[in-house]
Curated annotation (Swiss-Prot):
Residues 28-58 bind DNA. The keyword Glycosyltransferase does not apply. It comes from the Eukaryota. Residues 75-130, 606-626 are annotated as: Disordered. It is found in: Nucleus. InterPro entries: Transcription_factor_dom_fun (IPR007219), Zn2-C6_fun-type_DNA-bd_sf (IPR036864), Zn2Cys6_DnaBD (IPR001138). Transcription factor involved in regulation of the dehydrocurvularin biosynthesis gene cluster. It comes from Aspergillus terreus. This is Dehydrocurvularin biosynthesis regulator. The keyword Hydrolase does not apply. Keywords: DNA-binding, Metal-binding, Nucleus, Transcription, Transcription regulation, Zinc.
Amino acid sequence: MSLSHVAPSHDAYGQAKRRKVRKGTHSCWECKRRKMKCRFDPRIASACNGCRRRGSPCISQEFPEDLEEAVMNIGTTSSDGTPFDGRTRATTPSERTDQILTPVSTVREPSQYPRSPEQHLPTGNDTSQRKYERLSRFLHELLPSRADRESIFKASRHSSILSHELLTTPYITLHQNGLQTPESLLMTPQPNSHPVLIARYMLQFALFLQHLPPDLYKEIQGLSEPPRATMERLADAAIYHVTTNEALINSIESLECIMLESLYQVNLGNLRRSWVAGRRAMSLAQFMGFHRPDNQTRYYKALDPKTNYDPQIMWLRIIILDRQLCLLLGLPEGCTDHTMASSETRIANNCPMGRLEQLHCVAMSRILDRNASQPSGRDLTATRAIDLELQKAAGSLPSKWWLAPKLDSASTDLQAMFWDTRRLVLQICHYNLLNQLHLPYMLRPSTAGNKYEYSRITCVNASREVLSRYNSLRSFNRIAYSCRTVDFLALMAAMALLLAHMDSYRDGAENLLANQYLSDRGMIEQVQEHMSEINRLNSDELSAQSADLLKSLLAIDLEKGKGRVSVREAGSEGMLPQDGMGPEEESVVRVHIPYFGIIRIAREKQHATTASKPPVDRSPSSNSDAQLRFSTLTHPSNALPLSPNTTSNPLSFAVADAAAPHEFTTPFAHQQQQPCQPTFSNPGLSLTPSPLMQGGYPDLAAGSEDWAFQRVDMAFFESIMRNVGGDL
């Protein structure tokens, strides 16, 4: 059993005296150090969610902190009595060829699955046929019992089907043959099967458990361990022992395993780990020759003759997921292959959803290429060209295909429900691409007519389409690990739509969005409610933080406030000398984003414009308008104090007169944070770093429990602020 799942025993604590703690203190030592909310899953009450994810001991503050070492020593001997270090260390792939118990070097966490005893380790004297026999037996012993599998399948027979075939099989084939049902997982690999085949089964089973509805947990009785614990144990073992072991990565099934790992991580919300796994899959696929247009040169083998795979589909899936994650995380794409949409015949032979995905794949590459270049006047031309490509892609499908499908939880046709859900998610992805494409121009002021009005309206409409479909999806599907990327897309769409409404209150400008404000606000409130409910049902950190962020932004009531929104560089010609400081600041809204800092929105009196700018005609009613400054933060690349020369990119927009500073100055309610103190103040600039910034970024491979937004928030604001330096 995992050490992190074992409550500290009386033997571990001995006669240690309990400490006196402040009333209301419930967090463990590890969560206190990380300044994270200590949450317990009622289904797994032996350790908090954060410690379970990290694989660290969950020690209550009632006990001395130095007892953690005693707990770490529990179970640090193998079954044959051989002691081994319970803490992990970085290892090389060659070391893990001889020692299968070593965790992957890129994830420095204690192992969350039983370690194999020394007698299971392969030796150099083994023949090629028996080289991995001991590893196979060890992995096979980790599989859930048949009784557990039957109990789970019986409870889920009317609620889910398997989707992992999407990674290797064309849509047309799946439509014809149908997707597999959970009962197909009753047949496990043999104990002497190749480790890769057993690992593939383990990852497939873990993905199936990710899609279990949370209300089924109460119906499944008599299991040896909770389904979520089984999911984590199987996936961790497969990843540590197989998918990250270079000696085992030489077959089509091993590539499939890495793709399953990437999908598993993205479902958890671990976008960064998923991206790393996806890059490993891309490299292996290139070794196998998948990137060749004709794919006639084969550099791979199949371990099981029954394995169904299509190299072109697998290559397409790898590239699509890589580009989706790159857009979310603000990273460069892994390859610039556009061949999936270069042939009209190749596109025409696909089904409608397949054609759209191929065209989306190329559009994502062009957006990433634009974002990777320095901002210039050519950006707008490239943006319009990509927009036309997306219009053409949408036009390749029938008009009725774009109607949002109705998802009925009472339906018994699981195959039809799966494809309707897939269609809805693909529609959301299309509108998200429009958002990503035009976001850098959404808040741009134009000195040449309505140069950027098209981008602004496109972002608004695309955000509405994303949010309406998200509400439809989450009314039907409350599983946190299902359709995970849609949660990130909905959060970005909600923030974009709110900022667009703030931008609509420009001085002297006609508000084209005024009539839609209340309905848009109601839709975002519904999104926030769905995220709160998903967190309640699943104890999901991403949903909790997203709901808190939207709640803070929704506290800004634009019905009462008027002003203007502008995007300017600090120190630029349009910068107001007294913008944001002094006693004239009447109210403040502070929104905390972990590892990003404080977004500070201050309602202030309007100041006169600079002499170099022509005066703006104002009506008498606008003379007392308030201006809000939205201060973004420098990235927490280090813990050094901000220098007086630090610059920022403020946004200005309106907030309600009734807003009081004390109403919004606290960080997320579910996080334990210390009060934030400004480290730098200067006329026209306000920076308030987060306490979490003082230690820099979290680990690069930090999971969603420690870094819920995974840098998606930073990429979003970077995109908004892309072209602030002048009118391009």
